[in-house]
Regions:
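WD40/WD-repeat beta-propeller blade N-cap
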Residues: 6-13, 50-56, 92-100, 136-142
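Blade-level signature of beta-propeller repeat domains, shared across WD40, Kelch, NHL, RCC1
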Residues: 143-168
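Solenoidal tandem-repeat scaffolds enriched in leucines and small polar residues
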Residues: 1-58
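WD40-repeat beta-propellers
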Residues: 1, 16, 35-39, 77-81, ...
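Loop/turn segments within WD40 beta-propeller blades
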Residues: 17-23, 60-66, 104-109, 115, ...
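Loop/turn-rich, solvent-exposed surfaces of beta-rich toroidal or solenoidal domains
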Residues: 97-123
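Conserved strand-to-loop turn within each blade of WD40 beta-propeller repeats
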Residues: 29-32, 71-74, 115-118, 157-160
Length: 168
């Protein structure tokens, strides 16, 4: 049974993420370079987050639901405050620039993992806004990042058919 249909009428939706703390809230991002926060009960947009210059490829909520991160075609990962709508942080990997295709927080939110279409994964310290390391994560475009429920692992999956599980 369909509960609601959300339609911003602004391009293709490439990613979505449900709030970890509010069962009525979800985010969508895509080719419009916008992120919309929705209320599923009303099928209405609660807030629109701007500032991206290209497709929004992936989203992940901060573990307490107070913020979220985006991975964008312009190589940037951005963190936004859900309540105020303000951009908290913009993270750009070192050259060569490539599309950010995946993003995931650690269970504490202190670390942010970002994947790229050049098979690289960056690990960021979200408090200092600094890159901690860059890892090789397969042989091709990274399609997805996810963390384990216990927070001990993050997995990366790519177009080469491989999934790599990393200890945090």
């Amino acid at each position: 049974q369909v509960v609601s249909t959300l339609d911003a009428k602004q391009g293709d939706v490439l990613c979505l993420q449900m709030s970890p703390t509010d069962p009525h809230t979800l985010l969508t991002g895509g080719t419009s370079a916008l992120v919309h926060m929705w209320d599923k009960r009303t099928a209405g947009i609660v807030r629109t987050f701007e500032g991206h210059r290209a497709d929004v490829n992936a989203l992940d909520f901060f573990p307490d639901g107070s913020a979220f991160a985006t991975a964008c075609e312009d190589s940037l990962c951005r963190l936004f405050d859900v309540r105020t709508g303000s951009e908290l942080l913009s993270l750009d990997r070192p050259p060569p620039r490539s599309a950010a295709t995946a993003v995931a927080f650690s269970s504490s939110g202190r670390l942010l993992f970002s994947g790229y279409d050049t098979h690289k994964m960056c690990v960021w310290d979200t408090l200092r806004g600094e890159r901690i390391s860059t890892l090789n994560a397969g042989n091709t475009h990274m399609a997805y990042l996810g963390r384990s429920p216990d927070g001990r692992f993050v997995a990366s999956a790519g177009w080469d058919g491989k999934t790599i599980v990393w200890g945090i």
